[in-house]
Amino acid sequence: MSFVFQAEVRSDLGKGASRRLRHADQVPAIIYGAGKEAQSITVDHKKFIIAQEKPEFYESVLTLVINGEEVNVKVKAIQRHPVKPKLVHLDFVRV
């Protein structure tokens, strides 16, 4: 099964900007690895909540479409809210 998600580059960084994204049903994330510079992005919360329920989500190579460019990544870390069923932050590593 292949997973393809839309993502947007984010320019506003920091605690306040991340909170605003979470209130807008977006999840702040970062992509790093493969000898390239780290890139801060945002992804849709609802799509990731649904996808992460499947076991193959954690094993598969995911495709993130960022500004029309496809980037193959794997999930490295997921930070979850301690009480609510929400994702707080995602870390991806380039493949």
Swiss-Prot record:
Keywords: Ribonucleoprotein, Ribosomal protein, RNA-binding, rRNA-binding. The gene is rplY. This is Large ribosomal subunit protein bL25. Part of the 50S ribosomal subunit; part of the 5S rRNA/L5/L18/L25 subcomplex. Contacts the 5S rRNA. Binds to the 5S rRNA independently of L5 and L18. InterPro entries: Rbsml_bL25/Gln-tRNA_synth_N, Ribosomal_bL25/Gln-tRNA_synth, Ribosomal_bL25_long, Ribosomal_bL25_short, Ribosomal_L25_dom, Ribosomal_uL5_bac-type. The keyword rRNA-binding applies. Pfam families: Ribosomal_L25p. The keyword rRNA-binding applies. Belongs to the bacterial ribosomal protein bL25 family. One of its GO terms (cellular component) is cytosolic large ribosomal subunit. This is one of the proteins that binds to the 5S RNA in the ribosome where it forms part of the central protuberance. GO terms for biological process: translation. NCBIfam families: bL25_bact_ctc, PRK05943.1.
